[in-house]
Regions:
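Peripheral, non-AAA+ core regions of ATP-driven protein-machinery
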Residues: 1-220, 224-227, 334, 492-512
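Basic, amphipathic alpha-helical bundle interface domains used for macromolecular binding and assembly
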Residues: 35-46, 59-61, 68-78, 293, ...
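Short loop/turn elements that form and flank the Walker-type P-loop nucleotide-binding site
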Residues: 60-63, 100-101, 133, 151, ...
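Catalytic P-loop NTPase motifs of RecA-like helicase/translocase cores
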Residues: 113, 308-315, 358
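Conserved alpha-helical scaffold flanking the Walker A/P-loop in AAA+ ATPase domains
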Residues: 210, 266, 271-272, 283-306, ...
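Walker A/P-loop
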Residues: 221-262, 328
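The Walker A (P-loop) glycine that initiates the GxxxxGKT/S ATP-binding motif of P-loop NTPases
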Residues: 223, 287, 310
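Walker B catalytic acidic pair
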Residues: 303, 309-310, 321
């Protein structure tokens, strides 16, 4: 009995599992069987592998071939197993050195001509292989720069199956081939090249944006068209600090699976920015798809900003899918074959008009909407969703005074410096805890540090008694108050900080 063995990696969400690929060749009627819980796309590998082997100048073994993907309990999908199946088959047939291929991880899709095509998710797959103790990895040449980002990985990039077989001792030539380029759908966007200095007026909205950046808070802006909501949202990523090394690896892994990562620039070190159209489906926001689940816009915005312009125009199903990541910081995709988890700890920015026609506030043309239309328009933004949004402000039309050439607004650099200082204070206060920003801190932890003086939170007590705030809303106001204190350089929030946080929570209404 001749066995060929090598390794591959199966991805489920961001979690990678090393798979042993075994090929058994028996002297029987020629056949090719693939076992070990492969899906339909992986079952097609039989024909691709056979065509690639013969196109590479190697003889196809005229025997009964059984390829096992172990452990069989793990689901396997996608074309990334092609190279490992081909190498195991050639090793079992004695066409290459079996010992050389054993213990090496092989990732890549095979074309019918034997060329290696790049696959998605190479970064988390290689990271999982290295974590399991398998440092040597063979990938398509187009994926080699991405695989090399994993510390400790010994990466070999190949253009064709013939090159891989030749390196393992096959008696064939390995001619140069035209490489298959990477197929990036749309390179992940970091902070847009925009500055707050371009935003005229809007002092309250600018302050809310600074507070959101400093504390990691979610933000709702309501205002007529042209008031600057989109401009403000696009400038939020520019106020956020760079990602840490661990965050950069995690964010890059998400975009690697999504196919939106260009490895030329290295790890993604700036917060990503996602702004899906209001016609987006729940699957495009949450993720999913056939075969290997792919992250949606919410996961691609991990450690960055998810901006939903014209939020009431999104379907109710889409808006309700946001509740899980807002509460838990991850998205869970349930399949019959397993559960895929993607991180989704983003800052949500919602923008909405005051009514369907958009002229509900300000001067000029009168609003043409009936009260029922207004109620139905905002009913999409449900109470449970808005209850999770810490900052809710009105963005009013800009006055003529804001257009005065002598009035100069602060730049993003100045505001970002204050944000960085506030984040440093939070990091010191939250050292030794699992939280990084005020927006993540539980209410009980904050209330303990306010002390027993109820006068400090008397405004919150009245708002709670009058039904203006839920208990979750009280905690959200306290989080914003701590952020205001951090921006001001104080050790803790004062009563005026809590009052201002309450105004920022209730679109300027406070206890009125």
């Amino acid at each position: 009995v001749v066995l060929g063995r090598t390794l591959a990696v199966s991805l489920l969400g961001l979690a990678g599992h090393v798979i042993e690929v075994e090929a058994h060749l028996a002297a029987s009627l020629p056949a090719f069987s693939l076992v070990g819980l492969p899906d339909a796309s992986l079952a097609e590998a039989r024909d691709r592998v056979r065509a690639a082997v013969t196109s590479s100048g190697l003889p196809w073994p005229n025997r009964r071939i059984t390829v096992n993907l172990s452990p069989a309990s793990l689901p396997k999908s996608g074309s990334g197993f092609d190279l490992a199946i081909a190498v195991a088959t050639l090793a079992g047939a004695g066409l290459i050195d079996p010992a050389a291929a054993r213990g090496v991880v092989h990732l890549g899709e095979l074309g019918l001509d034997g060329r290696l095509r790049p696959v998605r998710g190479v970064l988390p797959a290689v990271a999982a292989a290295v974590a399991a103790g398998h440092r040597r990895v063979v990938v398509p040449a187009a994926n080699a720069p991405e695989a090399s980002l994993v510390p400790g990985a010994v990466v070999v990039g190949a253009h064709s199956l013939a090159q891989v077989a030749h390196a393992y001792g096959a008696d064939i030539d390995a001619p140069d081939v035209v490489p298959v380029p990477s197929d990036h759908l749309d390179v992940a966007r970091a902070a847009p090249d925009a500055d707050l200095v371009d935003v005229l007026g809007q002092d309250e909205a600018r302050m809310a944006l600074e507070v959101a950046a400093a504390g990691g808070h979610h933000l709702l802006m309501v205002g007529p068209p042209g008031s600057g909501k989109t401009m403000l949202a696009a400038r939020l990523p520019g106020l956020l600090p760079d990602l840490t090394e661990a965050e950069a690896v995690e964010v890059t892994a998400v975009h690697s699976i999504a196919g939106t990562f260009d490895p030329v620039g290295g790890l993604l070190r700036r917060p990503p920015f996602e702004d899906p159209h209001h016609t987006a489906t729940p699957a495009s926001i949450v993720g999913g798809g056939s075969g290997v689940p792919r992250p949606g816009a919410a996961s691609r915005a991990h450690r960055g900003v998810l901006f939903m312009d014209e939020a009431p125009e999104f379907s109710t199903a889409v808006l309700q899918t946001l509740r899980q990541p807002l509460e838990h910081g991850e998205l869970v995709i349930h399949r019959a074959s397993g559960v895929a988890r993607f991180p989704a700890r983003f800052q949500l920015v919602l923008a909405a008009n005051p009514c369907p026609c958009g002229r509900g506030v300000g001067k000029g043309l009168e609003c043409t909407c009936r009260s029922e239309q207004r109620r139905r328009y905002f009913s999409k933004l449900s109470g449970p969703l808005l209850d999770r949004v810490d900052l809710q402000v009105d963005v009013l039309p800009v006055s003529r005074a804001a257009l005065d050439p002598g009035s100069v607004a602060e730049s993003s650099g100045i505001v970002a410096a204050r944000v960085a200082a506030a984040r440093a204070v939070q990091a010191e206060r939250l050292a030794g805890t699992p939280w990084r920003t005020n927006a993540e801190v539980p209410g009980a932890w904050m209330r303990e540090r306010l002390g027993p003086d109820r006068r400090l939170v008397s405004d919150l007590d009245r708002a709670l008694d009058r039904g203006l705030l839920s208990l979750r809303g009280v905690d959200r106001v306290l989080r914003v108050a701590w952020t205001l204190a951090d921006l001001a350089g104080r050790q803790g929030p004062r009563r005026d900080d809590i009052g201002q946080a309450l105004l920022l929570r209730t679109r300027g209404q406070g206890l009125a």
